[in-house]
């Protein structure tokens, strides 16, 4: 990205422009040609750019989350339990992506989502609010759906759709919101 290199940080409306440029770079990833999640960058909940290469060698659960959904309490509780049980011993990583596409159940901004996550004692990584369906869907989510299609259609049907990604960055399983996170344990064992 030498085109954008500069000795001084560049700000746009008070935000460091590297995050914007990185998001633009992620948009340029052809999700149909991508082989692993490591080819993507995302913004974390604080707006910092994160290369998913940081998850190399880890089994991951990637999930779209919402704070005002009927599944919220159970899923956050069980995702935290899975993380506590396996993050140190097995290297499990959980990536939560807030999404407001289903019943407007994640209406707040990132600051409000952070406050909610703090109240829920979320101990896994949280990312910027994204679209998971449609023309504005984040390329990572297009990739996940492309690699692990859904029943009838590949689209995400509701909040708390979960993907298991193996240690090589390849999506290997997909679960709908009716599948409780604790029910993923048996399948996770295949990938440690």
Task: Give the label of every model feature segment.
Residues 1-25:
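N-terminal mitochondrial targeting presequence
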Residues 21-53, 74-75, 139:
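N-terminal "domain-start" segment that seeds a small globular fold
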Residues 139-142, 146-192:
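Thiol-/selenol-based redox modules, centered on thioredoxin-like
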Residues 88-108, 123-134:
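Thiol-based oxidoreductase modules, predominantly thioredoxin-like and allied folds used
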Residues 111-159:
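Short, internal strand/loop/helix patches
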């Amino acid at each position: 990205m030498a085109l954008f290199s500069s000795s001084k940080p560049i700000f746009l409306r008070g935000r460091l422009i590297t995050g914007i440029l990185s998001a633009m770079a992620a948009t340029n990833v052809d999700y149909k040609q991508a082989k692993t999640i490591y080819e993507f960058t995302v913004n974390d909940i604080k707006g910092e750019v994160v290369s998913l290469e940081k998850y190399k060698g880890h089994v991951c659960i990637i999930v779209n989350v919402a704070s005002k959904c009927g599944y919220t309490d159970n899923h956050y509780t069980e995702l935290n339990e899975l993380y506590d049980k396996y993050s140190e011993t097995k290297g499990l990583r959980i990536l939560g992506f807030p999404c407001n596409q289903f019943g407007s159940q994640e209406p707040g901004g990132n600051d409000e989502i952070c406050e909610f996550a703090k109240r829920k004692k979320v101990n896994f990584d949280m990312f910027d609010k994204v679209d998971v369906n449609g023309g504005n869907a984040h390329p990572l989510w297009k990739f996940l759906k492309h690699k692990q299609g859904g029943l009838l259609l590949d689209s995400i049907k509701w909040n708390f759709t979960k993907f298991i990604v193996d240690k090589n960055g390849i999506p290997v399983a997909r679960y709908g919101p009716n599948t409780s996170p604790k029910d993923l344990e048996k399948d996770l064992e295949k990938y440690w």
